[in-house]
Amino acid sequence: MKKPLTHIAVVGFVMFALLFGSTSWVQYVTADSLNNNPLNNRRILDQLARDRGPILVDGTPIAYSEPVDDKYKYQRKYGSENLDPRAYASLTGYYSVVSGASGMERAAGDYLSGDSDALFYDKVGSFFTGEQPRGAAVELTIDPKVQQAAWDGLGNQNGAAVALDPKTGKILAMASTPGWDPNALASHDSTEASEAYKNLEAADG
C-alpha cells in the first residue's frame, strides 16, 4: 500500500508545483504586460475612477475628465467650444470602458492616469494625504490654427495631412478624414460605446 500512496503523493506534489509555478508566472513575470495592455478592461475600469489628466493644445483641453454621478466617477470628454473633437480624434484617440484606449490616450496613458514612475512623488503625496491620485496633463505641439486649416482642407475627401515646423521638427498639425467623434466611444453606456466602435471599424475597413 505504501508504494501507491507514495506515487499519489509525488503526483500531487508535481501538480501543485506546476499550478504554483504558472500562477507565479502570471503574477510576477507577465503582470506588467497584462496591466499595460490597452485592452485590459479591468485596468480601464480602475482608472476610470481617477481624475485622468487632460490632453492640451495651446493650453486648451481637447480631452479631459469631468466628475459624474455613476460608478465610474469620471466621464472622459473630447473637444471644446472652439475645437471640433473630430478634427483631433486621430491624435487623442479614445478612452473607452468597452474597447480600451488608442492614440495619445494609449501612448501617454501612464502619465494621464498618474501611473508613470515620473509621478512617483505625487503618488507618495497622495498616499499620505489620502487624496485620490490624479493624472498629469500632456501638452501637444499642435498649433490649433494649423490643425483647423488641415482639417478644413481635407474636407469630404478620405486622406491625411501633416505639418511640421521646419526648424524644430515639431508636429504642428496631424489630421485625417473621415473624422469621428471619440465622445461616443467614451460613453459609459456599453451598448452605445460598442455601437460607436463597430461604426469606427466599419469606416476604417
Task: Cite the ranges covered by each PLM segment.
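Extracytoplasmic/periplasmic proteins that interact with beta-lactams or build/remodel peptidoglycan
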Residues: M1-A160, M174-G205
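Surface-exposed patches in mature extracellular/periplasmic domains of secreted proteins
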Residues: A160-P166
